[in-house]
Amino acid sequence: SVEELYGHGIYDDGSVVREFLGKRKRLYADLLANDYEPPEELQYKTEYVQQIDDYLYKDVTYDAMWHFVGGLFPSPYAATSVREYFARGFEEYTMNNKKELKQSCPVLFNKIEALHALEE
């Protein structure tokens, strides 16, 4: 996978993680404002956590998540971990949804652009 090839280049400077956590904190606040009770870890965990995935999938539901992630994450599942955030962003990039990705996830978009340039 691209992440295995360039993992150090993706996460080392912390920019993708900072962007992801900023989005997770906003998601947390949006969920609270809409009478959900998200786990505290949603604000600061970057790795995959089963409790967070279960909460988003079972309690909020991925259908409802589309309402919260528009303009924030590439998809509901991209909110589950920073690795999934990168993977879904990369998928959007390769599926030619670059404009939307650049608008909603500029740091992630620029990181993928830089990795793409390395391959050429």
Ranges and model annotations:
Residues 1-120:
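Active-site-flanking segments in enzyme catalytic domains
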